[in-house]
């Protein structure tokens, strides 16, 4: 049996193509229902996310070409695109390369945002669906569980998921460094920019107590306040609101400063000098830089956040090198296990034959064994079983070892001939 993987990802295909393979579309059968009917395919996994669509199957090695063509035809039909158009988007991997790719995917090394945790859950969900459809067996079960173990090892032994790699998450990271805990804090959004909205969403997930939204257009402020279950205010109210907020995210890009040093200083006096975290992601800047010189005020602009993001991204790239080494080691372990499958039937038959001889000889001794006590009879049986295990140990260990060196089939054939094993 061989392993074959066919797929496309954000690296090889546009979203307009990938979304055609979504599992969420109504009135569509699951691809596994079709794949399981294809000749020569024994096991299958179908993974469909926003950023990738992949089919992993185990099939007879001699039928690999036909299986590949069949899967591509099925994907073209499902996506409603020509085979030629689909071919430009696809990659095809087999054997150890397919296993390596799956390990990298599960470990988030192949993700759009390297280190993100969602992909592992998506792979587990795809595996659950494959199990429910009855299209998994010894090979895919082993590979998938191994992939989960590899992903866990990568996450615990490297810093691949450490630190923020988006401006929104960078804002959360900085806020945590300043305040420690964010639950109970209050946010003021000034302006309705996309980045400020994303930053606010990330902060709200940390248990933020409430949010104020100020905008030049009050209708837009009301709209955003409704999204965040907050309160809309006009820009003129910002100096007054400053006294009661902990975090300000500003993104108006106005020609003049929306928050001046004097406004911030006045607010600090009324706040009894509680910390104030100002995030200015506007271009041109919304907050007068001198405001950052005030005690207990922490001012960061878009360049500061981007520097942090770049530093964190470089850190993840360094950690990715460690992760790749782990994956190479685990691919080697999988290959070693896979090579033993060729000799397993011989080992099983060898054990059955030797145990059969033992049972036959014990049967011949039934007449005199009856004169023994029950305890002594058990001792005899235990002794015979121990002798069998010792006889079996060296040959089977040698056979497994040689299978890892790709000599397994030759040694298995020799063992079968020596002991006249049937199959």
From Swiss-Prot:
GO BP of this protein: protoporphyrinogen IX biosynthetic process from glutamate
Q: Which organism is it from?
A: Syntrophus aciditrophicus (strain SB)
Keyword flag Cytoplasm? no
Q: How does it assemble?
A: Homodimer.
Q: In which pathway does it act?
A: Porphyrin-containing compound metabolism; protoporphyrin-IX biosynthesis; 5-aminolevulinate from L-glutamyl-tRNA(Glu): step 1/2
Keywords on this record? NADP, Oxidoreductase, Porphyrin biosynthesis
**Residues reported in the UniProt entry to bind NADP(+):** 191-196
Query: What gene name is listed for this protein?
Result: hemA
PROSITE patterns to which the protein is assigned, alphabetical: GLUTR
Which Pfam families does the record match to this protein? GlutR_dimer, GlutR_N, Shikimate_DH
Q: What is its EC number?
A: 1.2.1.70
Superkingdom, taxonomy of origin: Bacteria
The positions annotated as site (Important for activity) read 101
What is the UniProt domain comment for this protein?
Possesses an unusual extended V-shaped dimeric structure with each monomer consisting of three distinct domains arranged along a curved 'spinal' alpha-helix. The N-terminal catalytic domain specifically recognizes the glutamate moiety of the substrate. The second domain is the NADPH-binding domain, and the third C-terminal domain is responsible for dimerization.
Active-site residues, Swiss-Prot/TrEMBL: 50 (nucleophile)
Q: Which positions in this protein are listed as binding substrate?
A: 49-52, 111, 116-118, 122
Q: What is this protein called?
A: Glutamyl-tRNA reductase
Question: What's the catalysed reaction?
Answer: (S)-4-amino-5-oxopentanoate + tRNA(Glu) + NADP(+) = L-glutamyl-tRNA(Glu) + NADPH + H(+)
What the record says about family reads:
Belongs to the glutamyl-tRNA reductase family.
């Amino acid at each position: 049996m061989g392993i074959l993987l066919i797929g496309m990802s954000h690296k090889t295909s546009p979203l307009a193509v990938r979304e055609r393979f979504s599992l969420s579309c109504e009135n569509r059968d699951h691809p596994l229902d079709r794949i399981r009917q294809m000749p020569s395919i024994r096991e299958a996994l179908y993974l469909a996310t926003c950023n990738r669509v992949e089919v992993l199957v185990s099939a007879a090695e001699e039928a690999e070409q036909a299986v590949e063509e069949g899967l591509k035809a099925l994907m073209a039909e499902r996506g409603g695109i020509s085979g030629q158009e689909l071919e430009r988007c696809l990659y095809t991997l087999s054997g150890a390369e397919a296993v390596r790719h799956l390990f990298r995917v599960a470990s988030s090394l192949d993700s759009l945002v390297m280190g993100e945790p969602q992909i592992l859950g998506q792979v587990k969900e795809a595996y659950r669906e494959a199990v429910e459809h009855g299209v998994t067996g010894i090979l895919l079960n082993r590979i998938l569980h191994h992939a989960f173990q590899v992903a866990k090892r990568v996450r615990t032994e490297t810093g691949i998921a450490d630190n923020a790699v988006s401006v929104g998450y960078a804002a959360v990271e900085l806020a945590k460094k300043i305040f420690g805990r964010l639950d109970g804090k209050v946010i003021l959004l000034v302006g309705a920019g996309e980045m400020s909205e994303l930053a606010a969403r990330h902060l709200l997930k940390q248990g933020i107590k409430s949010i104020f939204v100020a905008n030049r257009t009050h209708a837009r402020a009301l709209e955003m306040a409704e999204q965040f279950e907050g309160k809309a205010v006009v820009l003129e109210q910002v100096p007054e609101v400053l006294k009661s907020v902990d975090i300000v995210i500003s993104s108006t890009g106005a020609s003049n400063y929306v928050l001046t040093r004097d406004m911030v200083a006045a607010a600090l006096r009324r706040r009894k000098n509680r910390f104030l975290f100002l995030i200015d992601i506007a271009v041109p800047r919304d907050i007068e830089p001198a405001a950052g010189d005030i005690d207990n005020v922490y001012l960061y602009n878009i360049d500061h956040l981007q520097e942090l993001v770049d530093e964190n991204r470089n850190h993840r790239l360094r950690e990715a090198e460690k992760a790749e080494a782990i994956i190479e080691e685990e691919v080697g372990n999988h290959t070693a296990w896979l090579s033993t499958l060729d000799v397993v039937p011989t080992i099983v038959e060898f054990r059955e034959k030797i145990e059969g001889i033992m049972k036959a000889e014990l049967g011949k001794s039934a007449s005199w064994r009856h004169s023994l006590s029950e305890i002594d009879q058990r001792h005899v049986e235990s002794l015979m079983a121990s002798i069998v295990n010792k006889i079996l140990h060296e040959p089977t260990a040698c056979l497994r070892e040689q299978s890892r060196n790709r000599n397994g089939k030759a040694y298995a054939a020799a063992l079968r001939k020596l002991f006249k094993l049937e199959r």
